[in-house]
Amino acid sequence: MTGSARFQKGIRRWAASAAAMALALAGPAGADGLSVIGFDDAVHHWQLKRGSDYPRHDESDVRAIADNLLLMQRNHGGWVQNRDPLQVMSAGDVKQLLAEKGETQGSFDNRNVFTQIEYLMGAFVLTGEQQYREAATRGLDYLLRNQFETCGGWPHSVPAQAAYQSRLTVADEVFSGPLTLLRRISEARAPFDAFDAETRATAKAALARGEDCLLRLQVRQGDTLTGWAGQYDPMTLAPMGGRTFELTAIVSQETVAILDYLMSIESPSPEVIASVAGAAEWLRAVQIEGWRLETVPLQSEQAYRYHNAKFDRQLVADPGARPLWARFYDIADNTPVLANRDGMRVERFDQIDPERRTGYSWYGNWASTLLDRDFPAWRCRVLGTTSEGAPCT
């Protein structure tokens, strides 16, 4: 999972990718390529460890990118996370990926699986190559096969290599990404109009289970609806933490991504309407005013296990600052939840170790666009009134 600020827009990026793909499919085959925005998170993580000094295919080279996705796809139909599908593969790279085909590991983390399925279907429509549709179908089968029966979400990774990876996961679009994919398939939106009616019906049933689960997972404080945790026990559906520094909490960033998805539903049910309104009100109630997050350059670069840092971060009092949100909020009292890798909660941002302070996003402006623009527009579309109850003009 990532705390990187470049992925704050959550499902908006996925929607942008889908829109760009639809435009590409409407034009001459292969003229402009297909959007690769959906792979940004994977590429970011790949380059964090390996740098960016390696040859990459041009974004317009659809066949080369799709062929890489075929090469990276495991025999079970899924993919491991954090690979760059635009990488120009050496003979050694190809040999290694072929040798890994039979390995069991796969992951839905960091916008994985649903992005590959969409790209491969787009490549099929553009090129007519049946192997791309077949690979997308295997990927979809993998996604459907790993949907929890107890509640229609997905685990972080299969098989789990750490305790948190077996949990039902909302973080990093592990939930909202597949739901968006399933909705687009069930509604036969391009490029998924190339799927048959049986596949669309299967996707629609999985979508219904997923949306029902999503509403069940929304955290309540008494009778008040709030946001969503990052992970849950798949049997009891109790909120849980992730990695050692990701304690059990309501997660503002993931709540925004979930709301982006729920607000995309054309004709929402009363339950969805109540869910969106409750979560938006909670986000407004927990916003932090009078503070800004400042980046401070370091005299020398600091090397850590998972990243190198040329800066530190600090919270600075500023009466004119835009609202901030803590990433994590206490389920009981909505106080910000901060912690170190040892799993110990701390009270202040400056008590977080520099490695986690620079390698994770503890504060951000995640809900600003949603509250200022997207939620009011949704309210007018669905309810016909402003937040003050006045008719929309």
PLM ranges: what are they?
Residues 27-31:
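Sec/Tat signal peptide C-region and signal peptidase I cleavage site
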Residues 133, 137-140, 144, 158, ...:
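Eukaryote-skewed repeat-based solenoidal scaffolds used as protein-protein interaction platforms
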